[in-house]
């Protein structure tokens, strides 16, 4: 418990020498009474370029009301936000992962510059969540994340659809399985309003993670963006931050090794996005908590997959709310012994205490009981082998084949692979290789939802696999192996795969191998020459020079 709630902001607001600062703040409308109170930063990721974050301006207003009611003075600021869905399949997607670290930097800079006493970060689209968490952890002042909520599903010909179905329809049209008119109907119906993409894709995966890890108040994320209850969620969050400030509860108090294990278990139990691997590795680094790829595989092996959620399952994200919310997921984790129930959360209560308050909707089958899981192990697998010595990641739902040996179809960019798929050049049993799309090589490690959806839409989802040093959208399904490390641009074995080489994927043995002798692989690696950097100046060049391997979270490393 802290007795000085203004121990940071008084440096900005108090005393004769700060008259200039007060004069400028009064020009905005703040009064002496306002400036005598604790200053609460409202880090907003509102932006007008996507539905995911479009509701955050209105949500921020309710948060600020709650802060004022509880005795604080809110000050709102904004960060950048890049939409994966809007930029997918273009050069713009290279900015997405890079924005995660820029968001972290901007929140850190604002916190250090204005010396806020506490911070609430309003987040929604994929990279805003880990970026904000990383920034708060660096500052380590009282604070937490508030998720804007999921979009409602669209409806087309009697079934629920999401953005995933739009991308898969593009592939179906290219394969002659759907008309352009039907694609237009799906396009017009898939996204009916505000909110983040509506399956257990990356945004909802990370929103779940943040509640289970303890950095978001449990019971807030599952409330959909357009639901009238969201106003109350925002107001109560504004009140809660003042309580968190009084208790002096900081991110690094919450982000223990046990909390990270809980977070990984939540990804496994819900069939969450492989992007969670990158983001949790990066967040653990900021928190000073040892975490490796192997931890994800170990925890996933012992955690059942219980949530029947898109992209591979039946339900969209709003059904989690209807089933009882993330509290029910927490209860499954705690009751099954898959999570550390004594881990503290931002409310001051333990995960077990929060889970005990879960109110499950009778008869719901979105979050299955522990004695009837979709499959007994989680969806995340970490593969190694001579093609991925430092590791790679794949997400499974349970219906995919576990062994595939086939010829490599090699592409040095996402665009080249997409052209081959929509041009009908990919055949059953092919293994598509997309390289030079890693953190350094892209740069920015683009998501491949357009490619993977085109494969599925063309009817090849069960017969074609994909291997890449890029990454995947949370909406991806099928045997799609990403995050291959070392990446091709660092001279990883992916760089020396040739068209027609045999690749062997054995998911049961957690391996992905190039079927060549060690001598042949060594000779090819010796002869390999790195390509010229794709950017020579600006943020892309700087990122490419400083970014670490995907196996380390693709974080920026200080030279």
From Swiss-Prot:
This is Dihydroxy-acid dehydratase. HAMAP family: IlvD. It holds the Pfam family ILVD_EDD_N. Keywords: 2Fe-2S, Amino-acid biosynthesis, Branched-chain amino acid biosynthesis, Iron, Iron-sulfur, Lyase, Magnesium, Metal-binding. It comes from Roseiflexus castenholzii (strain DSM 13941 / HLO8). Its EC number is 4.2.1.9. It comes from the Bacteria. Signal peptide: none annotated.
